[in-house]
Protein backbone atom coordinates (compact mmCIF):
# COMPACT_ATOMS: atom_id res chain seq x y z
CA UNK A 1 0.00 0.00 0.00
CA UNK A 2 1.21 3.48 -0.86
CA UNK A 3 0.83 5.63 2.25
CA UNK A 4 0.83 9.38 1.80
CA UNK A 5 0.93 12.07 4.48
CA UNK A 6 -2.29 13.80 5.47
CA UNK A 7 -2.13 17.49 6.34
CA UNK A 8 -4.79 19.04 8.56
CA UNK A 9 -4.03 22.73 8.15
CA UNK A 10 -4.78 25.53 10.56
CA UNK A 11 -5.51 28.28 8.02
CA UNK A 12 -5.02 32.02 8.67
CA UNK A 13 -3.27 31.72 12.03
CA UNK A 14 -2.51 35.39 12.62
CA UNK A 15 -1.61 35.47 16.32
CA UNK A 16 0.60 33.33 18.54
CA UNK A 17 -2.28 32.48 20.90
CA UNK A 18 -4.21 30.94 17.98
CA UNK A 19 -1.60 28.21 17.50
CA UNK A 20 -2.80 26.29 20.57
CA UNK A 21 -6.43 26.71 19.47
CA UNK A 22 -5.76 25.18 16.05
CA UNK A 23 -3.58 22.37 17.43
CA UNK A 24 -6.30 21.52 19.96
CA UNK A 25 -8.74 21.29 17.04
CA UNK A 26 -6.48 18.70 15.40
CA UNK A 27 -4.29 20.73 13.05
CA UNK A 28 -0.89 19.21 12.31
CA UNK A 29 0.34 22.15 10.23
CA UNK A 30 -0.05 25.92 10.47
CA UNK A 31 -0.61 28.42 7.65
CA UNK A 32 0.20 32.02 8.55
CA UNK A 33 -0.60 35.22 6.70
CA UNK A 34 2.27 37.68 7.05
CA UNK A 35 2.27 41.10 5.49
From Swiss-Prot:
It is found in: Secreted. The active site is at residue 11. The keyword Secreted applies. It catalyses: an N-(acyl)-sphingosylphosphocholine = an N-(acyl)-sphingosyl-1,3-cyclic phosphate + choline; an N-(acyl)-sphingosylphosphoethanolamine = an N-(acyl)-sphingosyl-1,3-cyclic phosphate + ethanolamine; a 1-acyl-sn-glycero-3-phosphocholine = a 1-acyl-sn-glycero-2,3-cyclic phosphate + choline; a 1-acyl-sn-glycero-3-phosphoethanolamine = a 1-acyl-sn-glycero-2,3-cyclic phosphate + ethanolamine. Belongs to the arthropod phospholipase D family. Class II subfamily. Contains 2 disulfide bonds. Its cofactor is Mg(2+). Mg(2+) binds at residue 33. GO terms for biological process: killing of cells of another organism; lipid catabolic process. This is Dermonecrotic toxin LrSicTox-alphaI-1. InterPro entries: PLC-like_Pdiesterase_TIM-brl. GO terms for molecular function: lyase activity; metal ion binding; phosphoric diester hydrolase activity; toxin activity. Dermonecrotic toxins cleave the phosphodiester linkage between the phosphate and headgroup of certain phospholipids (sphingolipid and lysolipid substrates), forming an alcohol (often choline) and a cyclic phosphate. This toxin acts on sphingomyelin (SM). It may also act on ceramide phosphoethanolamine (CPE), lysophosphatidylcholine (LPC) and lysophosphatidylethanolamine (LPE), but not on lysophosphatidylserine (LPS), and lysophosphatidylglycerol (LPG). It acts by transphosphatidylation, releasing exclusively cyclic phosphate products as second products. It comes from the Eukaryota.
Amino acid sequence: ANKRPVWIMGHMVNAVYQIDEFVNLGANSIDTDVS
